[in-house]
């Protein structure tokens, strides 16, 4: 479930639980680094992107500043939903890994240097 506000996610989960839904509800986060992309996602999904978020992003002339803002915004949002009891977070890359990696780095999540695709238990040979 894509969202832009931790309260929206928490409210959705609360309503779902009252309706008898017992499965995990994993919040989805799209890194906020490109206002045009966010508008397209809004048009496709009907999920409103806060105007203040779009305005803030549009105010940065350099993509590097948008990326920094998006990583900070994303990490705060992730911390908020995890604090609210989310079982995890789904990060949407839409074929752009860097913004997701920036969020993870800001949160202190780093790749395991010992991991390789060949050693992964789900790799088929």
Predicted feature residues:
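Extended, intrinsically disordered, low-complexity segments
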Residues: 95, 110-125
